[in-house]
Design a protein with these regions (language model features):
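Glycine-rich nucleotide phosphate-binding loop and flanking beta-alpha elements
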Residues: 72-73, 102, 130-131
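Conserved phosphate/ATP/ADP-binding segment of small-molecule kinases
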Residues: 106-178
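Glycine/small-residue-rich loop that forms an oxyanion/phosphate-binding "nest" at active or ligand-binding sites
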Residues: 68, 76-125
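Small-residue (G/A/S/T)-rich helix-start motifs and N-terminal tracts that mark the onset
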Residues: 1-88, 93, 158-178
């Protein structure tokens, strides 16, 4: 495993900016502007497109795909399924942000459908969201109400990340409270 250093990060950022990858984002309207600006600042070119009619074509042109489960709708889920299939067919990485995964049955069911059907390069979420994906509820955690995270220790987050990474065969990042 390579140690993460400032120099390594700077070199990777230079490569990212040189390649200027197109990233197909199917995200929620709450964060679309922030996500687009973050990708632009990093050197990528985001395309914010959540229509099932565009999903296959845009994913075919993209270098990577990002799914955000916030403000989930039937059409947005359909677009994700179409996009994920195209990304899988073309071996393109997909990142999943399971926003509020444990807050409703629909979000959890939809997120689990994606995780069962497709391989993700990475999943990022707060402790409550990752716990929901593992169908666990550590004693230190409260029930998830929305996109807020339960109080957890660093050790809890590390344990959740390791368990989820093993289960879903991908990189898992457990973020702090939102």
């Amino acid at each position: 495993m390579t140690n993460i250093t400032t120099e390594n990060c700077a070199a990777l950022l230079d490569i990212l900016r040189e390649k200027n990858p197109l990233v197909h984002c199917i995200t929620n309207y709450v964060t679309a502007n922030t996500v687009a600006n973050g990708l632009l600042a990093a050197g990528a070119s985001p395309v914010m497109a959540d229509s099932p009619l565009d999903a296959e074509d845009i994913t075919a042109k993209a270098s990577a795909v990002l799914f955000n489960m916030g403000t989930l709708s039937k059409d947005r889920l359909r677009a994700m399924l179409i996009s994920a299939q195209k990304a899988a067919d073309m071996a393109k990485p997909i990142v999943l942000d399971p926003v509020g995964a444990g807050s409703t049955d629909n979000r959890l069911r939809s997120t689990m459908q994606l995780l069962r059907q497709f391989r993700f390069a990475a999943v990022r979420g707060n402790a409550s969201e990752i716990s929901a994906l593992l169908m666990t509820s550590p004693i230190t955690m409260k029930a998830e109400k929305g996109v807020d995270s339960a109080e957890t220790t660093l050790e809890d987050k590390i344990s959740l990340a390791k368990k989820a990474a093993k289960r879903y065969s991908c990189t898992v990042m457990v973020t702090g409270s939102t």
